[in-house]
Amino acid sequence: QVVNRIDVLYESLALKQKPPFDEMVYRLGEDTKALDTKVAPLKSLARAFEKTAMTKENRFDSDRLLDLVRGMLVFQTMEGVAAALEALGNSKDRGWTVVRMKNRMRKPTGGGWADVLLNLTKNDDNQHFICELQLVHKKMLVTREDLRGHDAYDDFRTAAEFLELVQEKAEAG
């Protein structure tokens, strides 16, 4: 995305793109028979600042905040995930373009989370504001929600980011 001011990202872009993104996610969930469709509130400003502070390069640059607007489709089977990916292959027809994909099924995060993460932009947005969509197998959510694994993961992620920052400063002298 081309905007690097967090206030503009929130006030002008995130608030503008959230309604059409949410609509697209719900429609995609219906079309692909997702088990569950989740759209999140805007990422908190505190977490957004935390993310920009913890980046190694270009600290506090907000142009890398790609998940202020986000959603999730949950599928019973991997075939469902594949159906959503196929439908998103034609996302330009839905008014959106996939600009990045991370297959974290193949390589899970350090905390063990596995999904397919997609970044999309609305075709008519000349600011190229990026939204995030996660395609998730239902079994991943058992750990995250039913066993309260996400709270533990949040704590782990924040601690790991902080330790990485401290190590970086120590190595820099």
Predicted regions and their residues:
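Charge-rich, low-complexity segments
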Residues: 1-65, 82, 157-167, 171-173
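Long beta-strand-rich cores associated with HINT superfamily self-processing modules
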Residues: 53-173
